[in-house]
A protein has these predicted regions:
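Charged, alpha-helix-forming regions
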Residues: 1-253
């Protein structure tokens, strides 16, 4: 499962929401489940998440994975997100607000969570042909900050160009899931949110990120980002010491 793909419509990537790290991870596992089912999902599909899968993918203890599933019963069901969409009759842009899931079923004895995505979520994670972002689950498996996970997604939506245009501060905060009274001082925002997130991304994912702050007068009004793909280490083929030199030379030729 570590090489499984997370695929989301860019509308969902750029949505505004506040999910705890465990909740983001459960959504990822459900998306992987939906993709690996091979036959698509609907708003009635029930997707199973096992504590063992959570523990294996995110390298956490059994207790931590059980806790993540138990807490989701109450917390994830109430979470919402919002995104912009076009009203087809007029072409006007409006705001869609939706829950993530319409149903949650938890079996404690089996350490099993069964979720059903809300109707608005289903088309944003399936049948995607354009305007979508994909990445390997293993890239975010070692991120321990909910902000780092969100920032990674926001960045790789721009993978082809390697940079993210300036994000106005309020919009950026909304996408990271910050409420109005959280880390209002810029020094706190950088210390608690931005810089730790970039540090984790640079250490644990496949990209290296830098940022630039933009000002209006003396006030920081937004941020832009540049990133590049890390070089993948080359795996050297190990020779069998029992292989005669004759065959080695033929192979190396």
């Amino acid at each position: 499962m570590k090489n499984s793909l997370i695929v989301k419509d860019n509308a969902l990537i750029n949505a505004s929401y506040n999910l705890e790290l465990t909740e983001q991870r459960l959504i990822m596992l459900a998306i992987i489940n939906a993709r690996e089912s091979g036959h698509g999902i609907t708003a009635d599909s029930k997707l199973e998440i096992h504590a063992s899968d959570y523990a294996k993918l995110f390298n956490v203890s059994a207790d931590a994975s059980y806790k993540a599933l138990r807490e989701a019963v109450n917390n994830l069901f109430n979470r919402q997100f919002s995104y912009t969409a076009e009203y087809k009759r007029t072409g006007k842009i409006g705001i869609v607000r939706s829950r993530w899931v319409s149903r949650i079923f938890y079996v404690d004895d089996l350490a099993l969570l069964e979720i059903t995505f809300a109707p608005d979520v289903v088309p944003l994670i399936t049948r995607l042909e354009e305007h979508f972002t994909k990445y390997e689950a293993k890239q975010v498996a070692h991120l321990t900050s909910k902000y780092a996970t969100r920032l990674y997604e926001l960045l790789i939506a721009w993978r082809e160009v390697g940079k993210v245009p300036q994000l106005e501060l309020k919009e950026f905060r909304n996408r990271l899931g910050l409420v109005d009274n959280e880390y209002t001082a810029m020094s706190d925002f950088k210390k608690r949110v931005l810089e730790p997130s970039i540090k984790q991304i640079n250490e644990h994912t496949d990209i290296t990120v830098t940022y630039e702050q933009h000002k209006k007068g003396r006030i920081i009004s937004g941020f832009s980002f540049k990133f590049k793909q890390k070089k993948q280490p080359q795996i050297e083929a190990k020779r069998d010491p029992n292989t005669p030199d004759f065959f080695v030379k033929m192979t190396d030729a």
